[in-house]
From Swiss-Prot:
<keyword id="KW-0677">Repeat</keyword>
<keyword id="KW-0472">Membrane</keyword>
<feature type="repeat" description="WD 2">
    <location>
        <begin position="145"/>
        <end position="184"/>
    </location>
</feature>
<feature type="repeat" description="WD 7">
    <location>
        <begin position="365"/>
        <end position="395"/>
    </location>
</feature>
<dbReference type="GO" id="GO:0005834">
    <property type="term" value="C:heterotrimeric G-protein complex"/>
</dbReference>
<dbReference type="InterPro" id="IPR036322">
    <property type="entry name" value="WD40_repeat_dom_sf"/>
</dbReference>
<keyword id="KW-0807">Transducer</keyword>
<comment type="similarity">
    <text>Belongs to the WD repeat G protein beta family.</text>
</comment>
<dbReference type="InterPro" id="IPR001680">
    <property type="entry name" value="WD40_rpt"/>
</dbReference>
<dbReference type="InterPro" id="IPR019775">
    <property type="entry name" value="WD40_repeat_CS"/>
</dbReference>
<dbReference type="InterPro" id="IPR020472">
    <property type="entry name" value="G-protein_beta_WD-40_rep"/>
</dbReference>
<dbReference type="InterPro" id="IPR015943">
    <property type="entry name" value="WD40/YVTN_repeat-like_dom_sf"/>
</dbReference>
<feature type="repeat" description="WD 4">
    <location>
        <begin position="235"/>
        <end position="276"/>
    </location>
</feature>
<comment type="subunit">
    <text>May interact with RGS9; this interaction stabilizes both proteins and increases RGS9 GTPase-activating protein (GAP) activity, hence accelerating the deactivation of D(2) dopamine receptor-mediated signaling.</text>
</comment>
<comment type="function">
    <text>Enhances GTPase-activating protein (GAP) activity of regulator of G protein signaling (RGS) proteins, such as RGS7 and RGS9, hence involved in the termination of the signaling initiated by the G protein coupled receptors (GPCRs) by accelerating the GTP hydrolysis on the G-alpha subunits, thereby promoting their inactivation. Increases RGS7 GTPase-activating protein (GAP) activity, thereby regulating mood and cognition. Increases RGS9 GTPase-activating protein (GAP) activity, hence contributes to the deactivation of G protein signaling initiated by D(2) dopamine receptors.</text>
</comment>
<feature type="repeat" description="WD 3">
    <location>
        <begin position="193"/>
        <end position="234"/>
    </location>
</feature>
<feature type="repeat" description="WD 1">
    <location>
        <begin position="103"/>
        <end position="142"/>
    </location>
</feature>
Length: 395
């Protein structure tokens, strides 16, 4: 039986019957093969004839998972905070709101920084996507989407375009111009199409490709110019809520988190799920790579944030307190990686010492749940978005 099936359809000769037909890209014992639908059905029937039922395959999968956890446990001999015991504690943490961006008519759901360290794009439940000047708080561009709940937005690396999407199941790209009165909607390009809502999007190293995640349980890589699907990523068993690309110097991988409580690491070239972590007790709302690319953090509805070391292949730290009972909606690292900023559903932002596992500050100001937190490209400030309809710049 095949161990993973991809729904992406291509056209060409079937590897089994050699006829030119629509093909399903599947993996058999980790080897990619292209079979037509008839040959896939025949292969499934042959598997059933051998006694390979869904139940037996599930049991085999659970057995392999248990063995994997046993091997991981053998290497779990020390916690991160124990290693960092002798490190000097951080000094007094002072950060406050420097700017408040007002203009959305409903909950702010997502935001992203431009690489120029000055401009911000944000999206909201009101269906609007706004480009801001973070220095002056002025709005530079505004687009009204054809749907409400625009849950994803991203700035292109060049700063010349923004991408966004939500309940329309699409990822749309809008080129930006110097003319602030130009109608951006007329230049909209629909790049990606999922079968459920778009939860997150991110450009790769250039403006030419974009990565998306969706409520249909998949992630996908698209060509922006043609709108062609380049690679699909299947491995989550529920909605995918967040994704993050590895720092460019560490290779072509990304991490995703979802409602199945899993955080998966993917190889963008092969489409393979190369690592998987399942230690949260509820939905994973946010994932973010450590600046070096050797680890990543996650924030979950179980009221914890966690750190996973990719080289050790295990969880190495949990950031939580008994007094925190609301879920973490968004996480991001400081430029050095020493601090972890986490937005919570109790309206607060907690700042954690990544190495020692202690909380160094609580930032108050928002009047509803914090939905997104992003550190600026130069690390001098960070922006938070909230269901109170505002964004705040902290420094």
């Amino acid at each position: 039986m095949c161990d993973q099936t991809f729904l992406a359809i291509t056209f060409g000769p079937c590897d089994k019957c050699s006829e030119n037909k629509p093909l399903m890209n599947i993996y058999l014992k980790n080897e990619p093969i292209n079979y037509c639908s008839l040959c896939v059905e025949m292969m499934a029937c042959q598997g059933l004839a051998k006694g390979e039922t869904v139940q037996s395959l599930k049991a085999e999968s659970e057995s392999l998972k248990a063995k994997l956890e046993e091997e991981r446990a053998k290497l779990h001999d020390v916690e991160l905070h124990q290693v960092a015991e002798k490190m000097e504690a951080l000094g007094q943490f002072v950060m406050k709101t420097r700017r408040t961006l007002k203009g959305h008519g409903n909950k702010v759901l997502c935001m992203d920084w431009c690489r120029d360290k000055r401009r911000i794009v944000s999206s909201s439940q009101d269906g609007k996507v706004i480009v801001w000047d973070a220095y002056t708080t002025n709005k530079e561009h505004a687009v009204t989407m054809p749907c409400t709940w625009v849950m994803a937005c991203a700035y292109a690396p060049s700063g010349c375009a923004v991408a966004c999407g939500g309940l329309d199941n699409k990822c749309s790209v809008y080129p930006l111009s110097l003319d602030k009165n130009e109608n951006l909607a007329s230049k909209k390009k629909s790049v990606a199409m999922h079968t459920n809502y778009l939860s997150s999007c991110s450009f790769t190293k250039s403006d030419m490709q974009i990565l998306t995640s969706s409520g249909d349980g998949t992630c996908a890589l698209w060509d922006v110019e043609s709108g062609q699907l380049l690679q699909s990523f299947h491995g989550h068993s529920a909605d995918v809520l967040s994704l993050d690309l590895a720092p460019s110097e560490t290779g072509s991988t990304f991490v995703s988190g979802g409602c199945d409580k899993k955080a998966n690491v993917w190889d963008m070239r092969s489409g393979q799920n190369v690592q998987s972590f399942e230690t949260h007790d509820s939905d994973i709302n946010s994932v973010k790579y450590y600046p070096s690319g050797d680890a990543f953090a996650s924030g979950s509805d179980d009221a914890t944030c966690r750190l996973y070391d990719l080289r050790a292949d295990r969880e190495v730290a949990i950031y939580s307190k008994d007094s925190i009972i609301f879920g973490a909606s968004s996480v991001d690292f400081s430029l050095s990686g020493r601090l972890l900023f986490a937005g919570y559903n109790d309206y607060n932002i907690n700042v954690w010492d990544v190495l020692k596992g202690t909380r160094v500050a609580i930032l108050f100001g928002h009047e509803n749940r914090v939905s997104t937190v992003r550190v600026s490209p130069d690390g001098t400030a960070f922006c938070s978005g909230s269901w109170d309809n505002t964004l705040r710049i902290w420094a």
